Amino acid sequence: ETEHQKRCTIAIDGKTIRGSENEKHKAFHVVSAFVAENQLTLGEVTVPEKTNEITAIPELLDLIDVEDGIVTLDAMGCQKKIVEKICQRKADYVLSLKGNQGDFHSDVELFFSEFANKYPKHTTTEKGHGRVETRGIRTLQ
């Protein structure tokens, strides 16, 4: 086994709890940390109304042990303070980046365009949840 294979992947994601809405409050929204290799939820926090996942993720990271793990987050979690918290907790990270970060997305695309033909790209396509998702990854050494 390589060192990477021994490390766990901790997927952090937000979910709205269906059926939890009533006349007194909106549906509950939670952020959970899930270890894919074990099919185990490490922790979960409720996202308070009038806030979002960005404020709940650091709170969740303080509650769970992510040391030496690889934390994955969608584009909502692509925030400096969240990355700082992950590093403080001694974990690595893989983040999604979309156009919701001003010029950051185009700056990253420009940076990686230099490597486009030097390293192979792996692409997957999945159909589900009423959409087709294509993901590409290129590993630089």
Identify the meaning behind each predicted range:
Residues 81-82, 103:
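Phosphate- and divalent-cation-binding pockets in alpha/beta enzyme and binding domains
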Residues 92-97:
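Short hydrophobic alpha-helical runs that function as membrane-insertion/retention elements
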Residues 83-91:
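Short, surface-exposed basic-aromatic patches at helix termini and helix-loop junctions that form
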Residues 1-73, 78-81:
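Conserved, well-structured functional cores that handle cations and Mg-NTP chemistry
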Residues 98-141:
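An anionic, glycine-rich sequence signature occurring as long contiguous blocks
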